[in-house]
Amino acid sequence: MSRLLGGTLERVCKAVLLLCLLHFLVAVILYFDVYAQHLAFFSRFSARGPAHALHPAASSSSSSSNCSRPNATASSSGLPEVPSALPGPTAPTLPPCPDSPPGLVGRLLIEFTSPMPLERVQRENPGVLMGGRYTPPDCTPAQTVAVIIPFRHREHHLRYWLHYLHPILRRQRLRYGVYVINQHGEDTFNRAKLLNVGFLEALKEDAAYDCFIFSDVDLVPMDDRNLYRCGDQPRHFAIAMDKFGFRLPYAGYFGGVSGLSKAQFLRINGFPNEYWGWGGEDDDIFNRISLTGMKISRPDIRIGRYRMIKHDRDKHNEPNPQRFTKIQNTKLTMKRDGIGSVRYQVLEVSRQPLFTNITVDIGRPPSWPPRG
């Protein structure tokens, strides 16, 4: 009996031992499996960073310095691919600038008696960038306008021009730049050739210019509704100057302030280069416009009023004795004399807070009468 009981007890002990061994083996297997999972988790954590491991939803609003993205595609290693360059914030699309700007004043009081230091003008126009560039902050203009001023020894006039014109052009919602083309030396002045130079040099700085306003430095508009824009036809702005009794002096007058699109300017081969001294070039330009089948566009005479800063005639800007003969021959000369034949040398380009000054050597006039 005792032998039978001992055998049974031995079998029970073996069975219990076998169960304990089996339980131990299962526990060991489960332990290593859990350890492997934890190891993989912490490996991903250290590779991606704590913000992505603990708060994956927050990565969608993280700064651009974070390279990972929650929706990035997985690489062969199982980790998200990092883009080579992260896109920056997209600038909002601005609406087109209105045809009739809402901030215009209308008739303006223009006077030239108060001193006008350049520092004051600069303080009054904080939105104008270096070089005289401006872009409206709240709309997209249809044109990019280059304002070209032929210049020599007129610093006093230029300060008044900048004082009045920058606020006007800004209210007109223009994207524009101001270029003062300064003739070097004391030889005879050549207004039209300087305007050709301004056209070319402005395009070198910004090929987007598609409208060109050519303005004498001593003329200021008396109404900001006289919009400095280009249209389907060449535009004459200064149609009623005070020196002419606020009347158009004659039907073909195109002087003072005018505007042409880039295409219109090239169509007439620019302006003549051979008008040295005062007078004649405006009539030649009018002839070029007429000969190419275009017409002059003008504002209402009540809006196209201008005040001129009074001054004596400039030294070395005497009347051109050949002007009447040249005007009669525009048809013969316009193809050879113009933007395609202008020769000059740029001596200095200086970007000032309110304008870009370009000093140029445009050569000397031929002797009168011409030789040969």
UniProtKB/Swiss-Prot annotation:
One GO molecular-function entry: beta-N-acetylglucosaminylglycopeptide beta-1,4-galactosyltransferase activity
Reply yes or no: does the keyword Metal-binding apply.
yes
Q: Which InterPro entries match?
A: Galactosyl_T, Galactosyl_T_C, Galactosyl_T_N, Nucleotide-diphossugar_trans
Where N-acetyl-D-glucosamine binds, per the record, is at 280-283, 323
Pfam families linked to this entry? Glyco_transf_7C, Glyco_transf_7N
Indicate whether Coiled coil appears among the record's keywords. Answer: no
Q: What does the record list as coiled-coil region(s)?
A: none
Kindly tell me the pathway this chain contributes to.
Protein modification; protein glycosylation
Q: Locate the residues binding UDP-alpha-D-galactose.
A: 150-154, 189-191, 217-218, 278, 311-313
Q: Which residues are glycosylated?
A: 66, 71, 357
**Segments of this protein annotated with the region Disordered:** 56-97
The residues listed in the UniProt record as binding Mn(2+), with positions renumbered to this chain, are 218, 311
| Membrane-side (Cytoplasmic) residue stretches | 1-15
Signal peptide location: none
Q: Which domain of life is it from?
A: Eukaryota
Q: What is its EC number?
A: 2.4.1.-, 2.4.1.38, 2.4.1.22, 2.4.1.90
Give its localization.
Answer: Golgi apparatus, Golgi stack membrane
Family affiliation: Belongs to the glycosyltransferase 7 family.
Its annotated function is as follows: Responsible for the synthesis of complex-type N-linked oligosaccharides in many glycoproteins as well as the carbohydrate moieties of glycolipids. Can produce lactose.
Record protein name field: Beta-1,4-galactosyltransferase 2
Source organism (scientific name)? Homo sapiens
Q: Please spell out the taxonomic lineage of the organism that makes this protein.
A: Eukaryota, Metazoa, Chordata, Craniata, Vertebrata
